[in-house]
């Protein structure tokens, strides 16, 4: 098995044997990507940081059940997604507790998350801030499964095949979710894309 095991899976197998240093390496590598995914699913940066800790606690506790047949990052983001869904369900049962976190406080969703978003010059800072706000709003209005699929797609570690495993749906369904999410965002963000519409709106 050894030569076919990816480096992250090899680290996790060491964790399975009680190697704390290997666990620390995985946390160091994946902590920020996990926080980013959770923050954009829940739209709450502070809660994302707390929930990310729970993700890695779960990883450590589940080490005995880990098998190197699946890509480590797929397994990791599946845990993160499940905890996010649990939190979303909790919020739906206790909506009053979630009012303060309904507006994202994360420090800006980078415009590079979407290839078509226009790049602004330094003099356009105010407009760029408005763009980030519009992107956040458009993301928040996507159905949960589309938003999750799209955000997972933006993580370099996850392919369509990986995402389909995380979401528990077919490859074609995954591609459809991501396609519909992108189409919805393009439609809502048309004034801010590289079509010249932004400038037209400012005239």
Residues covered by each model-derived region:
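C-terminal edge and immediately downstream basic/flexible tail or linker adjoining helix-turn-helix-like DNA-binding
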Residues: 2-4, 96-100, 107, 112-113, ...
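Structural recognition of an alpha-helix C-terminal capping motif at a helix-to-coil junction
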Residues: 50-57, 70-82
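Amphipathic alpha-helical segment used for protein-protein interaction
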Residues: 13, 17, 92, 102-108, ...
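Arg/Lys-rich amphipathic alpha helix in sigma70-family domain 2
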Residues: 64-68, 78-99, 191
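Sigma70-family region 2
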Residues: 16-17, 43-44, 56-71, 90-91
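Amphipathic, Lys/Arg- and hydrophobic-enriched alpha-helical face
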Residues: 27-45, 62, 139, 188-191
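Short, charged helix-capping/linker segments at alpha-helix termini
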Residues: 1-3, 16-25, 35-54, 171, ...
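DNA-recognition helix of helix-turn-helix
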Residues: 85, 89, 138, 146, ...
